[in-house]
From Swiss-Prot:
Gene (name only): DBP3
Reaction equations catalysed: ATP + H2O = ADP + phosphate + H(+)
Domain Helicase ATP-binding, chain residue ranges per copy: 157-329
Domain Helicase C-terminal: 362-508
A GO cellular-component term linked to this record: nucleolus
Phylogenetic classification of the source organism: Eukaryota, Fungi, Dikarya, Ascomycota, Saccharomycotina
Biased composition (Basic residues): 35-54
Family annotation (PANTHER family): ATP-DEPENDENT RNA HELICASE DBP3 (PTHR47958)
Annotated stretches, region: Disordered: 1-96
Record note on domains: The Q motif is unique to and characteristic of the DEAD box family of RNA helicases and controls ATP binding and hydrolysis.
Protein's UniProt name: ATP-dependent RNA helicase DBP3
Intervals of motif DEAD box: 276-279
CDD domains: DEADc, SF2_C_DEAD
Function, as annotated: ATP-dependent RNA helicase required for 60S ribosomal subunit synthesis. Involved in efficient pre-rRNA processing, predominantly at site A3, which is necessary for the normal formation of 25S and 5.8S rRNAs.
Keywords annotated in UniProt: ATP-binding, Helicase, Hydrolase, Nucleotide-binding, Nucleus, Ribosome biogenesis, RNA-binding, rRNA processing
Species for this entry: Lodderomyces elongisporus (strain ATCC 11503 / CBS 2605 / JCM 1781 / NBRC 1676 / NRRL YB-4239)
Length: 535
């Protein structure tokens, strides 16, 4: 087939994809209206039933807590006097924390670019080693495989163990799951709470499963039960697991809202709420779902945590509306979008976008033959149709590749991710469904086959490499289609002390806009999931 025919075929595919997106958008709109109508009919009855159930639970809970205080008052007093850090009644800094020289604390904060906004002026010092914190044995034993707490863990744990609301602003791969997971599980074991008390919301199925896996590791050998709730699989199995007595639920917003509207899940006993990748959830249009979920949990007695890679106005407003004097812990300068300086960024400007596929093959051959030949490589396509085409191209060129995109079932995506993590396959092809939050260790190379729709997504893609203190390389193909992002890309490169190609400067500093030459204003619909809006 000639190059002209190929070009026409691609243009036809792109136009066809746009029509599919428009149709899907209208369908989603209609489904949303139907769901809203259904919800309004059920609201009055559910509100009354929920209030009665909530009042009854709170009354029983207060009664149990009063009995517990009567039975164990002397033990709590003794525990405090011996500097036990975590009980169900608060946190006390140990002598080991107090004995750390202030110069060492200052160096830790400076080296890791840590800032803490502490509205209640608690002035808790960071936990620099695991022997400085007293946790339940079943929890502390799971931490021995790590050398020391990560910065976000070091600084946030004291506040979280004291029951304070916390906002954590840090890059992905910073240890956020254990930052909120360790206090959550420790509190459940300490209080012997049998109710559903911990809820973690995340933007994608893959991230929800990853968090679930980490919490499962943390709870192994205990009576604490975790359940993952996400779209693309049967609701019935998930409902059954919740009703069998879950203590912790990790969920995507769309599926959880479905279960709430169906009356299949009761969140009235939640006392520890985590919003992970909050900025990403708002970008994906989950704001109303998040508000509904938060409104289904108790307003009083709830500890709320929010973790985010950036701190835009929308995230700040969410924190102001639903959090109580939160402590804000920031790792690095996250107010301004920036890339990890440990990542080498290579931007290759192409005059002809149809060169990308040939260049990708050459690049993969080069990187796979570097070192021991076992480097993990992550290739990003923009949308699922492109990913499917590139997957076929790589197979034809004898590459062993795993793939994650919207045309695959949840089982296929999970298997692909596991294959990549385990090293069975060292090449993963993904759309932006995998761009945030996923903990894929030891990714050496990220290749941006097609530049993403926003500069934020570019930075998020880069974050798949250079994790946990390691270095990485990001190779990006840039074409005239993305020239409106050239100015923002130049800023990111300069901010990370990376060279700016002369060919990129020719496009000048265009104003950023979240559109695409094919999809236009439908950019948010790119790579829609199989059966619901969460990926």
């Amino acid at each position: 087939m000639g190059s002209s025919s190929k070009s026409e075929k691609r243009k036809y595919d792109d136009g066809e994809e746009l029509l599919e997106r428009k149709k899907l958008k209208l369908q989603k709109k209609q489904e949303k209206k139907e769901k809203k109508d259904k919800k309004e009919k059920k609201d009055k009855k559910e509100k009354k039933d929920k209030k009665e159930k909530k009042d009854k639970k709170e009354k029983n809970k207060e009664s149990k807590e009063a009995e517990a205080r009567d039975d164990s008052g002397s033990n709590v007093q003794a525990s405090s006097s011996s500097s036990t850090e975590s009980t169900s009644y608060g946190y006390v800094q140990s002598s080991k924390v107090k004995d750390v020289p202030q110069s060492e604390v200052d160096k830790f904060l400076t080296d890791n670019e840590v800032t803490v906004e502490d509205p209640q002026h608690l002035h808790y010092r960071p936990i620099l080693s695991f022997d400085q914190i007293k946790l339940q044995k079943d929890v502390s034993s799971k931490l021995t495989k790590f050398p020391k707490p990560t910065p976000i863990q070091s600084v946030s744990w004291p506040f979280l163990l004291d029951g304070k609301d916390v906002v954590g602003v840090a890059e992905t791969g910073s240890g956020k799951t254990f930052a909120f997971g360790v206090p959550a599980i420790n509190n459940i074991i300490t209080s012997k709470n049998k109710d559903l008390s911990v809820l973690c919301i995340s933007p994608t199925r893959e991230l929800a499963l990853q968090i679930y896996d980490n919490l499962e590791d943390l709870t192994r050998g205990t009576d604490v039960s975790c359940v993952a709730i996400y779209g693309g699989v049967s609701k019935d199995d998930q409902i059954k697991k919740i009703r069998n007595g879950a203590n912790v639920v990790v969920a995507t917003p769309g599926r959880l809202v479905d279960l709430i509207n169906d009356g299949a899940v009761d969140l009235s006993s939640i006392n520890y709420l985590v919003l992970d990748e909050a900025d990403r959830m708002l970008e994906k249009g989950f704001e109303e779902d998040i508000k509904l979920i938060i409104g289904s949990t108790p307003a009083q007695g709830r500890q709320t945590l929010m973790f985010t890679a950036t701190w835009p106005k929308e995230v700040r407003e969410l924190a102001n509306n639903f959090m109580n004097q939160p402590v804000k812990v920031t790792i690095g300068d996250r107010d301004e979008l920036s890339a990890n300086k440990r990542i080498t960024q290579i931007v290759e400007v192409l005059d002809d976008k149809f060169q990308k596929e040939k260049k990708l093959i050459n690049l993969l051959q080069k990187y796979q033959n570097t070192g021991n030949g076992d480097n993990k490589i992550l290739v990003f396509a923009l949308y699922k149709k492109e990913a499917s085409r590139i997957e076929s191209l790589l197979h034809r060129n004898k590459f062993k590749v795993a793939a994650i995109h919207g045309d695959l079932s949840q089982q296929q995506r999970t298997q692909a991710l596991q294959s990549f993590k385990s090293g069975e396959c060292n090449l993963l092809l993904a759309t932006d469904v995998a761009a945030r939050g996923l903990d894929i260790p030891n990714v050496k190379y990220v290749i941006n086959l097609t530049f993403p729709l926003t500069i934020e997504d570019y930075v998020h893609r880069l974050g798949r490499t250079g994790r946990a203190g390691q270095t990485g390389i990001a190779h990006t193909f840039f074409t005239e289609d993305e020239k409106h992002l050239s100015g923002a890309l130049c800023n990111i490169l300069r901010g990370a002390n990376q060279p700016v190609p002369e060919a990129l400067l020719k496009y000048g500093g265009h104003t950023k806009k979240k559109t695409h030459s094919v999809y236009g204003a439908f950019y948010k619909d790119v790579d829609m999931p199989i059966d619901s809006k969460e990926d």
